């Protein structure tokens, strides 16, 4: 378990405002995480290649099948606001 002072320091670095209850709870949780990391550090990983994902994942693509799309009028019919045949949205500054 890490101390409340350490939890408060990490929270300050992350710009998090924690209550006393949250500090106490986070101390236990962070301590458990650090214990898990220490167990991993103790493993003999000689010969184990580094990997970002332990599973051999590949993308599954569907066939590209052209089909009829929505007509402009149908798409604009459900828009809250339109202008000159286009969607009108609030400006983002």
From Swiss-Prot:
Q: Which residues belong to the signal peptide in this entry?
A: none
Q: Which GO terms describe its molecular function?
A: asparaginyl-tRNA synthase (glutamine-hydrolyzing) activity; ATP binding; glutaminyl-tRNA synthase (glutamine-hydrolyzing) activity
- What Pfam families has UniProt attached to this entry? GatC (PF02686)
Among the GO biological process terms of this entry, one is:
translation
Descriptive protein name: Aspartyl/glutamyl-tRNA(Asn/Gln) amidotransferase subunit C
Quaternary structure and partners: Heterotrimer of A, B and C subunits.
Family per record: Belongs to the GatC family.
Reaction catalyzed: L-glutamyl-tRNA(Gln) + L-glutamine + ATP + H2O = L-glutaminyl-tRNA(Gln) + L-glutamate + ADP + phosphate + H(+); L-aspartyl-tRNA(Asn) + L-glutamine + ATP + H2O = L-asparaginyl-tRNA(Asn) + L-glutamate + ADP + phosphate + 2 H(+)
Q: What EC numbers are recorded for this enzyme?
A: 6.3.5.-
**Keyword entries, A-Z:** ATP-binding, Ligase, Nucleotide-binding, Protein biosynthesis
EC top class named in words: ligase
What role does it play? Allows the formation of correctly charged Asn-tRNA(Asn) or Gln-tRNA(Gln) through the transamidation of misacylated Asp-tRNA(Asn) or Glu-tRNA(Gln) in organisms which lack either or both of asparaginyl-tRNA or glutaminyl-tRNA synthetases. The reaction takes place in the presence of glutamine and ATP through an activated phospho-Asp-tRNA(Asn) or phospho-Glu-tRNA(Gln).
Source organism, top-level taxon: Bacteria
